[in-house]
Each structure stands twice: as C-alpha cells, then as structure tokens.
C-alpha cells in the first residue's frame, strides 16, 4: 500500500518549494499562448520522463513553467512529472501538483469533463516511469476537495484496483451517502481487479451491513475474514454486537462478547455501552449494571452515554432509588448529568406517580444551569395530567411558553387529554384552537382525544362533527377514534349507527382491539341482543389477542343477569384458558349469577378461587355474600363477613 504521508520535515520543504513555484506559475495568464519555448509541444513531457531523478525532473518542469506553452502541453507535462514523482515516492509533492491541476481545469470545464481529461492525460503517459499509484493519489485528492463522484468515476475506470486506502475512502463515502447497493458492487469490482482487503475494509463492510440490517451477510464476512487469516478488531466486534443488541438477540451478543475476549480483543467503552443498552432494552438491568462494574475493573472511564442508558434502564424497571444513586457515581467520575439523563429520571418518577419528586428534579436542573427542553416539559405535563393535576400542568405549560420553548403536538395533546378527563371540553377546544394558531397542526391523537372527551360528556353531535372534520382534513381515524364513537352510540341506544361505524372501520382496514370488542359485546346485551353478543364472540373468538377481561366480563354479566349461569361459567373458563386472569369485576358478575340462582356450593367455591387468585373481596362482595349466607342459614359465615374489622374495602367496587 502506498504511504501517502511523508515525515513532517520533508513535507514542509516540498510544500514551501511548491508554493513558491505555484505562485509564480499561476500568476501568469490562464490562457497559454504559443509563444516561444525551449521545448516543443510534447518535448517537455518527454524530457521530464527521461530525467535521471525525480528532483531533476521537477526542476526541469519548474524552470520550463516560465515559458507559456499550450494547454495540451501543460496537461501533458503535468501528467509526466506527477508520474515521475509518484514513482519516486514523493507523494506529497505529487498531490500538490494534482490539486493545482484540478483547480486550473475546474476554471474552464465541468467537474465531470475535467475528471475525464485529467484521467486520460495521466493514462496516456507511455514510459517505463508510468506509475499506477497516480490514480490512487488522484482519487484521494478528489475526495479531499469534496469531488466524490469524480473520485468514484476514477476508481471504476481504472484497469486495476486503487490502493487499499483509496478503496477504503471510496467505500466509506458510499456508506456515508447510504448508497449501500453500490458498496457491494464496487467492492466486488475492486476485488476482481486485485484488491487484497484488510481489517479496515471489512469494518466499512460491517458498517454497511449494520445500516442495511443484513445480519446473515455479517456472518459470511466474518467467515471470509477468518479464511483470509484477518483477525477482527474491536471495532468490528463492537458493530457486530451492536447489531445483535439492536435486534434484542442478547444471547448471541453475549457469545460474541465472550468470543472477542477469548481471542484477546479487549472490549472498549463503545462495546460495553452497546451491551449495556441491549440489556436495558430487554429489561435485564442487573446484567447491565454488572457490565458497568466490569468497565470500572477494566479501568475505563464511563461517559454520560453509559450513565444515561443505565438511568433510563433502572427508571423503566421502576428502580428509581438505584437510578438516582448513579448520580453519585457520575460526580465521582467527573461526568455532568445532561438533559437526557434528567429527562429519563423525570419520566421514571412521572410513570410511578411521584410528581412531587419529578417537579423537584426540574428545579434541580435549573439550579445547575441546565435548561429544560420541550421533552422535559411534555413529560411533566403528561404526568401531571395523568395524576389529575391539570392546574399544575397548565402552570408549567405557561412557564415553558414564557421561556420561549415552543410546545409540540405531544405537549398540547397531553394537556388537552387532561382537560377532557376533567370534562372541561370548552378549555380543551380552546387549547386546540391555540395549537392551530401556533402553527402546530392537530393530529390523530388530538382528534381522538377530543372525540373521546365529547363522547364521555354524552355530546355525540360534537364528537361526530370532529369525526367528519378530521376525515375532511385527510386524517384517517384510528381504532381509538372508532371505539370511542361506537361505545358512545351504543350508550345513546343507537345501535344502527354504532354498527355502521364498526363496518366503516373494518372496510378501512383497521383491526378492532380488545376495547372495541368489549364495547360491542356490552352494547349488544344491554340492547337486549344477548344472542347477537354470543354470536359475535363465537365469530371472533379466534382473535384471542383482541379479548381482555373487560370483554369477557361484559359477556358474563349479560348472561348472568339473564339467568344463563351455566353458559356464563363456560365463558369464565374460556377467559382463563386464554391466559386472562379475572379481575374483581369478573368475580362480582359471576357471584351475582350464582347468588341469583341460589347455587350455594358454586358460590363458596368461587369465593375460595377468588382469594386463591390473590384478589381481595371488596365491601360489595362481602355484603353480597353475607346476605346470601345469612338467608341460607350460614350465620357464622355471615357474621364473619359483616365484622367491620375483617372487611377488605376497596375504593373501586363493581
């Protein structure tokens, strides 16, 4: 491989000499006349090629440059001296001449024509001093000047492969431009012309595989490297591991991680970071923390990326104390928590309902001169609205606007959802208008939230108005939109319109979810169409993922209230066979059915089953059972349940 860099002291001498020559040469008129010269049109190039040394050739070229020869002779003599200098390993001076020639030719022709002229001139040199290395130098100079397409054209036109450094630069340029198919075509072309790939070439190919998602291709490349006796370096192992972690293939990633250590390749911080990120994404935060300890043992300094990944992982695992303790480690290693780290911790506290702690972290950020961004405020506003603290959410909303942080659609949607939960539809609609005035277009989430809000306040007219408005604007309703409207129409005893919307939903290719099925079943039996509800279940019972405990409970409740306790029991059994654990409401529906039919044994067994499942009877359940036991002569059991000290009260009774 050509060594394109000379030692510093030699390079500086050539650069000084060339700059002096270049100034004198370029100061002449760009149009070269046919004035007298000591050489004829082609004799200068011939004389240069006949010189005994590169120094003599360059001196002759420099001296003759004072003469104003023709452009063709200029290009020919340049090509000759570049070949001579390259053959003498004077690469820096050769590249300086190539650069000067490119700049001269660019003034008078398009880059594509210029590259053709220059390539042909260099190729036309007929001499034993012809050096194939000039084309690699030409490629490198084109790349350095930002002329990638010209460099690529030269590499494809060459009769043999450029040197490995030029090939590496070409392939890397294609990867960076995401021209992945060209990477493999050009690589095969280079191989066919004599390129012997090295570990650096393979690293670029691994990068291409990673960005294309070609996992099987990486395995073939690794086998190819092994067959050529090329040892993968830490960067190749890291990108391999990174790809496995991205696809959640942690077992394979672990094997590769151990394999690299077995082969004497020490993981670097990026390798550890990839593994830690993979473990955190799959919820294995303990393994991730174990690798963090390995980093310390290996005497590597963890950076903010490693800490951010760990904080995010522990927050998602609801281990907020551990996540917070990592801040102490960050201080120890001189790593300043960044915005991402704080946003992760704030999000963790919001998901756990610790809004006081989350808002306190905002104040802590500001005390450290770390300005919150739109994500920080959106996380907090969403958390506050979930916890029904809409007034505090609005205060933060006004604060972020005062700080010139522009709310996103997610910010507006969170606050709109908060107002809808409070049934404050006027404020929600005003906020939607403000959203539009601010240049933020309402999206599917905005419309679905507003439609659901109006459905909850029984304003079906306003809900349908928004439904038509969103379709006019080209926003396609989703399953949430349709489910809210279907449920609302059933509650308004308008089954015909509910079924029309369900039909529209299916025609639009939108698959119903578990809430949709629950609304339909609930609507059918409450409209006195229990048989339709059962038929609907039987038609759709293959879609197990679309049935949850709510849908089954609605069906069970309908059957029990209509005296079909045996069929209800079968559905209760079906629910469990689907892997769905009954909740308190499911048990209440079944208990009411058994009590209504005075099925004492079944009632007792169901009560035991409920306790065995880990569901504590609430006040309603205890009262129902107490009255039933008392009416059937089980006084002790009734007294036990009515004893206030033994009542297990739950706020949400069914």
From Swiss-Prot:
Disulfide bonds: none annotated. The keyword Ribonucleoprotein does not apply. Keywords: Repeat. It comes from the Eukaryota. It holds the Pfam family PPR_2. PROSITE patterns: PPR (PS51375). PPR repeats lie at residues 37-71, 74-104, 131-161, 163-197, 198-232, 233-267, 268-302, 303-337, 338-372, 373-407, 408-442, 443-477, 478-512, 513-543, 548-582, 583-617. Belongs to the PPR family. P subfamily. This is Pentatricopeptide repeat-containing protein At5g61400.
């Amino acid at each position: 491989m050509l060594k394109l860099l000379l030692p510093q002291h030699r390079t500086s001498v050539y650069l000084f000499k060339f700059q002096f020559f270049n100034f004198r040469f370029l100061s002449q008129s760009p149009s070269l006349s046919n004035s007298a010269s000591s050489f004829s049109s082609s004799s200068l190039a011939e004389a240069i090629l006949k010189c005994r040394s590169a120094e003599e050739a360059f001196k002759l070229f420099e001296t003759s440059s004072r003469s104003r020869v023709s452009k063709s002779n200029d290009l020919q003599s340049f090509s000759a001296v570049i070949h001579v200098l390259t053959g003498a390993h004077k690469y820096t001076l050769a590249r300086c001449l190539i650069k000067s020639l490119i700049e001269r030719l660019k003034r008078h022709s398009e880059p594509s024509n210029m590259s053709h002229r220059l390539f042909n001139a260099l190729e036309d040199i007929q001499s034993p001093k012809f050096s194939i290395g000039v084309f690699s130098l030409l490629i490198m100079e084109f790349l350095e000047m930002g002329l990638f397409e010209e460099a690529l054209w030269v590499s494809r036109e060459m009769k043999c492969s450029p040197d490995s450094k030029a090939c590496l630069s070409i392939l890397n340029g294609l990867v960076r431009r995401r021209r992945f198919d060209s990477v493999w075509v050009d690589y095969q072309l280079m191989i066919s012309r004599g390129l012997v790939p090295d570990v650096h070439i393979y690293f670029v190919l691994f990068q291409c595989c990673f960005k294309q998602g070609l996992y099987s291709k990486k395995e073939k490349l690794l086998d190819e490297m092994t067959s050529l006796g090329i040892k993968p370096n830490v960067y190749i192992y890291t990108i391999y591991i990174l790809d496995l972690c991205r696809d959640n293939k942690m077992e394979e990633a672990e094997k590769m991680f151990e394999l690299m250590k077995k082969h004497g390749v020490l993981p670097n911080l990026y390798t550890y970071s990839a593994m830690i990120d993979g473990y955190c994404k799959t919820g294995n935060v303990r393994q991730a923390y174990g690798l963090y300890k390995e980093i310390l043992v290996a005497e590597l300094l963890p950076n903010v990326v490693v800490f951010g990944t760990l904080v995010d992982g522990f927050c998602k695992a609801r281990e907020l104390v551990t996540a917070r303790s990592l801040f102490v480690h960050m201080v120890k290693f001189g790593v300043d928590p960044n915005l991402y780290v704080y946003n992760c911790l704030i999000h963790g506290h919001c998901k756990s309902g610790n809004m006081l702690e989350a808002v306190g972290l905002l104040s802590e950020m500001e005390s450290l001169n770390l300005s919150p961004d739109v994500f920080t405020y959106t996380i907090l506003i969403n958390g506050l609205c979930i916890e029904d603290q809409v007034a505090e959410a609005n205060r933060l909303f006004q604060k972020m606007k005062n700080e010139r942080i522009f709310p996103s659609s997610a910010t507006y949607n969170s606050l709109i959802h908060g107002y809808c939960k409070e049934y404050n539809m006027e404020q929600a609609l005003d906020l939607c208008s403000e959203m539009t005035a601010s240049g933020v277009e309402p999206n599917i989430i905005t419309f679905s939230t507003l439609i659901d809000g109006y459905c909850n306040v029984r304003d079906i007219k306003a809900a349908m108005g928004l439904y038509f408005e969103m379709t006019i604007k080209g926003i396609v309703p989703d399953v949430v939109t349709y489910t809210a409207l279907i449920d609302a129409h059933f509650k308004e005893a308008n089954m015909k319109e509910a079924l029309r919307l369900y039909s529209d939903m299916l025609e639009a290719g939108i698959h119903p979810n578990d809430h949709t099925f629950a609304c339909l079943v609930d609507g059918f039996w409450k409209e006195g169409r229990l048989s339709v509800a059962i038929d609907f279940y039987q038609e759709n019972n293959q879609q197990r993922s679309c049935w949850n405990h709510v849908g089954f409970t609605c069906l069970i409740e309908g059957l029990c209230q209509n005296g079909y306790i045996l069929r209800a029991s079968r559905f209760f059994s079906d629910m469990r066979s689907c892997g769905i654990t009954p909740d308190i409401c499911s048990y209440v529906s079944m208990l009411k059915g058994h009590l209504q039919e005075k099925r004492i044994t079944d009632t007792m067994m169901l009560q035991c089953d409920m306790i065995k499942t880990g569901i504590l009877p609430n006040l309603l359940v205890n009262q129902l059972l107490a009255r039933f036991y008392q009416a059937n002569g089980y006084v002790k059991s009734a007294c036990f349940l009515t004893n206030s000290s033994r009542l297990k009260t739950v706020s949400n009774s069914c």
